[in-house]
Amino acid sequence: MKVIFLADVKGKGKKGEIKEVPTGYAQNFLIKKNLAKEATSQSIGELKGKQKAEEKAQAEILAEAQAVKAVLDEDKTRVQFQEKVGPDGRTFGSITAKKISEELQKQFGVKVDKRHIVLDHPIRAIGLIEVPVKLHKEVTAEIKLAITEA
């Protein structure tokens, strides 16, 4: 019996796959537990439509990420921070991914999720710093930060 998997089933198939499985296994286990449904011509058409819509959505997300990357990679896109600095040359407050995200929104109108900004630890130094941003699994940009003494 041909079935369309609605969820990943270890050793049998992944979500969205169409596979031939034993009839008893399909009826008594997969279909009963909503892990799969029978592959009729109508359900196959629905699946193809969903896959096309998903691909289109992924393409839009990728295009949006590339547009944001183009803005961030421009030389004039430099996020300005003014921080108080102690005698040892370190800032009193640290610059976190959240702060960087908020300043990008405020200064350039570019919305970047703070979870996409790759910081090993908060920035406490002054000067010019480049921070990588993972906008999409295929798109990575660099944010230029100019941290000056207040």
From Swiss-Prot:
The keyword RNA-binding applies. GO terms for cellular component: ribonucleoprotein complex; ribosome. This is Large ribosomal subunit protein bL9. Gene3D superfamilies: Ribosomal protein L9, C-terminal domain, Ribosomal protein L9, N-terminal domain. One of its GO terms (molecular function) is rRNA binding. GO terms for biological process: translation. The gene is rplI. Belongs to the bacterial ribosomal protein bL9 family. Binds to the 23S rRNA. The keyword Aminoacyl-tRNA synthetase does not apply. InterPro entries: Ribosomal_bL9, Ribosomal_bL9/RNase_H1_N, Ribosomal_bL9_bac/chp, Ribosomal_bL9_C, Ribosomal_bL9_C_sf, Ribosomal_bL9_N, Ribosomal_bL9_N_sf. Keywords: Ribonucleoprotein, Ribosomal protein, RNA-binding, rRNA-binding.
